[in-house]
Amino acid sequence: MAQPILSQKTSPSAERRASREESVIKLASKSASYIALAAATVLAGAAMADPDEDQLVINGEIEIVTETKAPAHVENFDTIYSGWRFRSDETQAFEIDDFDNPGMLGVEAALDVWATAEGSEGKSCADCHGEPDEMAGARAVYPKWNEEAGEVRTLEMQVNDCRETRMGAEAWKYNARGMTDMVALLSSVSRGMPMNVAIDGPAQSTWEKGKEIYYTRYGQLELSCANCHEDNYGNMIRADHLSQGQTNGFPTYRLKNTKLNSVHDRFKGCIRDTRAHTYAPGSPEFVALELYVASRGNGLSVEGPSVRN
C-alpha cells in the first residue's frame, strides 16, 4: 500500500527569516541605488557657473592673485583659480578688510602665543624668530623638504619641531586650535606672495605619492579628489559652487562650522564625504597629498586666513 505524501509546511520562524532576508536584499538594493544616484549627481553637476572676475585686494593694499596660468605639472586645465573666485559676493566681502574677517581672531590669539615663553627652555617663538613679519614667505614654500629630518614637512610639523627641540615644550595636536591659529598667523604675514612649493629633488617621491592619492577613487561613492575639483570645478552641487580645491587660502574660516580649518581638516572632510575611512591629520598620506595639492596652486597668492562657506 502506497504511503501518503506528507505536505511540507514552512514553520513560522522560517517564514519570518525569509521575510527579513528579503527586506535586507531590498534595502541593500535601495542603498546601492541611492549611492549611485549621489555619485552621478556629483559627477554630472546640477548647473555650471564659471568663477567670477572679481579681484581681491585686502585692506586696500595687499593684492591677491586669484587667477593665473596653471603650472606645467598640472595636466588637465590651463588656468588656476583661488577658491575665493567661486564664493558669493557676501562671502568674498569678508576678506576685503581684516576687521570683517573672522579668521583674524585666530591670528590675534596666535600673536599672544608668539610672544609667550614656554617649555623647559623658557623660550618664545619671538626669541628665535623676532616679529611674525620676519616669517614672511614661509607659508608660500610649505610643505617643503627638510634635509636634516629626511622628510617633507608641513608648517604644522615644523611648528611642533620648534616647540619640542627649541622650547622644550609639549607638541600641539596636529589640528589643535592653537596650532591652526599659529599657521593662520604665519599665513597672514605672507599674504600676496606667490605659492612656490618645490616638488623636485628629494621631495619628488612624496609628491608622486600625493598625486596617486589625488587620482584614487575612495569610498562607497568611488570618488577621487580629481572627480570634483578637476573634472567638475565650476559645477553647482547642493547649492555649493565647486572650486579647484586650491590650498593657498588655508587655514580657512568656514561659515559652516564657524572656526578656522586646516588643510588636513578639509582633506578629512572630503574623504569622509565619499563614505570612506579617512587618513589621520598629519599622516604621511595627508602630508603627501598636501604637497601635491599645494603645488597645483603655484603662482596663486597666499591668501589665508581665507573665508569660505
Range-by-range predicted roles:
Residues 1-23:
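N-terminal amphipathic/basic-hydrophobic helices that include classical n-h-c signal peptides
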Residues 5-6, 40-106, 143-208, 256-278, ...:
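Post-cleavage N-terminal segment of exported redox proteins
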Residues 17-35:
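Bacterial N-terminal signal peptides that target proteins for export
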Residues 107-109, 113-115:
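N-terminal carbohydrate-binding/catalytic regions of secreted carbohydrate-active enzymes
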Residues 118-133, 182, 210, 220-232, ...:
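The canonical Cys-X-X-Cys-His
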Residues 120-126, 238-241, 307-308:
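Extended intrinsically disordered, low-complexity coil regions enriched in Ser, Thr, Gly, Ala
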Residues 136-143, 237-243:
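Short cysteine/histidine-rich zinc-coordinating motifs and their immediately flanking basic loops
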Residues 188-240:
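Extended amphipathic alpha-helical interaction segments
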